[in-house]
């Protein structure tokens, strides 16, 4: 005899487009699915906007309070949303940067300005890096077209670079690496995928 339930899955890829995310989630709700899994911030936000009754699970979400624009955060959403987070221990990463680059003075942070989770990470780790004695400056790009130029600006003015967990940066590691390696500037990444593509550590 078979044990358990027969499950069917409907996997849709919005390719990072917010309007496509909304269309997909509306279809899921219309089809009265039992669960919705939102992978990354845009998908979670679209799912949250589409239903307050179907249970939603989030994954690849750095900070739920930021993603869901919740000012009163107690560790749970208080609604039909739960899930996992990929937020790195930013205080420990700042200490690791100090261990790896003790002689550095200026740290540049590169991230996509349209990703709320990246803004949150940059703001948070900046405080920890300043506590370690670094001068920190943010270098933001709006989309993948600006990545190389922004990386060059960061490399020109920084002794080392930090890149938080950032979807756009993760998809542009080759372009980032091409610039940073030419400039001989080390990159500390917020997560393993970016570290493999263009970083020296995470």
Q: What role is predicted for each listed range?
A:
Residues 1, 82-130:
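An alpha-beta-alpha
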Residues 58-60, 85, 108-111, 189-191:
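Short beta-strand/turn micro-motifs composed of small residues
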Residues 67-96, 196-202:
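Short beta-strand elements at the ligand-binding edges of bilobed clamshell
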Residues 11-70, 166-190:
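Beta-alpha junction/loop-to-helix N-cap segments that form part of ligand/metal-binding clefts
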Residues 2-21, 80, 126-144:
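Short beta-strand elements in bilobed, periplasmic/extracellular small-molecule ligand-binding domains
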Residues 116-185:
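Pocket-lining segment of extracytoplasmic ligand-binding domains
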Residues 34-36, 105, 159, 199:
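Conserved acidic residues
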Residues 20-23, 27, 31, 42, ...:
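Extracytoplasmic/secreted proteins, especially bacterial periplasmic and envelope-associated proteins
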């Amino acid at each position: 005899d078979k044990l358990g339930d027969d499950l069917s899955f409907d996997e849709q890829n919005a390719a990072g487009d917010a309007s496509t995310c909304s269309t997909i989630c509306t279809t899921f709700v219309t089809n009265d699915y039992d669960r919705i899994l939102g992978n990354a911030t845009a998908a979670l936000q679209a799912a949250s906007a589409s239903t307050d009754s179907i249970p939603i699970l989030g994954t690849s979400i750095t900070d739920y309070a930021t993603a869901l624009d919740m000012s009163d955060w107690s560790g749970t959403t208080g609604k039909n949303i739960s899930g996992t987070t990929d937020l790195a221990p930013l205080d420990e990463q700042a200490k690791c940067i100090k261990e790896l680059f003790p002689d550095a003075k200026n740290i540049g942070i590169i991230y996509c300005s349209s990703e709320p989770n990246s803004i949150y990470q940059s703001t948070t780790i900046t405080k920890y890096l300043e506590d370690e004695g670094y001068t920190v400056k943010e270098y933001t790009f709006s989309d993948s077209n600006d990545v190389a130029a922004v990386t060059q600006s960061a490399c020109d003015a920084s002794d080392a670079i930090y890149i938080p967990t950032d979807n756009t940066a993760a998809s542009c590691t080759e372009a980032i690496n091409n610039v940073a390696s030419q400039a001989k500037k080390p990159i500390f990444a917020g997560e393993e995928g970016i570290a493999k593509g263009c970083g020296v550590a995470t």
